[in-house]
């Protein structure tokens, strides 16, 4: 296995692990619409368009 492929493999594994993390850890969520953000966060959603919001489930200040 060449070094390039090894780095790519490690990158894929690491990114998958980041997505799995839960339990009150702030994680960026890519949201294109208010509805996208509402899937992850309760409370009022303000102008969530084409950016990443830091939020955890239940955080009213998602975007």
Swiss-Prot record:
Localisation: Secreted
GO biological process, one term: killing of cells of another organism
Keywords: Antimicrobial, Disulfide bond, Fungicide, Plant defense, Secreted, Signal
Disulphide bond pairs: 31-48, 37-53, 41-55
Keyword match Signal: yes
A GO-annotated cellular component: extracellular region
Main location (coarse class): secreted
Signal peptide stretch: 1-15
Keyword Disulfide bond: yes
Family note: Belongs to the DEFL family.
Protein name: Defensin-like protein 278
Organism: Arabidopsis thaliana
């Amino acid at each position: 296995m060449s070094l390039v492929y090894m780095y790519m493999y490690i990158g894929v594994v690491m990114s998958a692990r980041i997505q799995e993390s839960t339990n009150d850890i702030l994680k960026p969520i890519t949201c294109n619409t208010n509805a996208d953000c509402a899937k992850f966060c309760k409370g009022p959603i303000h102008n969530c368009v084409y950016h990443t919001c830091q939020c955890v489930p239940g955080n009213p200040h998602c975007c």
